[in-house]
Amino acid sequence: MTTEQTHPNPLLAAPADTETPRTRLSARGLTLAYDERTIVDGLDTDIVEGTVTCVIGPNGCGKSTMLRALGRLMRPRSGVVELDGRDIHRVPTREVAQVLGVLPQQPTAPDGLTVADLVARGRHPSQRWYRQWSGDDHQAVSAALERTGLLELADSPLEELSGGQRQRAWISMVLAQGTDLLLLDEPTTFLDLVHQVDVLDLVRDLHWQGGRTIVMVLHDLNLAARYADTIITMREGRVVASGTPAEVLTPQLLREAFDLEAVVAEDPVSGGPLVVPVGRAGH
């Protein structure tokens, strides 16, 4: 399967770029473990510049663990993660933070924090001991709040926000960091469908308007099909398929990766694949 960026969905279509995109993140022979339990085993994958990549797979297959490793939040037992061609663990922490933003699953913040306080934390990698806060920092925070539609809620406590607004605040913090490479671990968790679409529309706009490279872990196959250029499918700690939504979301692969019998139809809006579950395979 190819990882070449295509846009079967006219809603996702961006201006064509004739240059060959470079690989921003890659994993080679990546093995990840917690204590003696191996979660990811010998994984290879590439994240291409200027694309939205969704990682899918059944529960416990290692999606979030792989994302943590790509974001330099855990060291591999073996193998290597490369950021722009360099071993990510040999790149200084501050330099990584100026290039790569990570939003973990279910992030938490101290009580009493306002939206603006949270977003300002995204500027920490840009600060030095001799220059704690500057006009550039203020501008970056304001721009991030405006981009996520939260400027009017800047002084509101986080606990007063709806689930969708709170998730936007966390994304705003990552935006304020000023990176062009974003890793989002299940950014739609615990949100109703309207807020899921709202958050993913925001992510798509960040990709379109800012040219950002985005990697997301998602559970909803049809949302992954709608918003992704590339889908990486995992099972039992390995990548079993990688390609465009149409290449990956086939009845055979859904059976092999998810033990799911499904009909794959054409999405009437995007023209891409639409997964209609039938039942568990073999039952």
Ranges and model annotations:
Residues I56-P58:
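The feature captures the beta-strand-to-loop junction immediately N-terminal to the Walker
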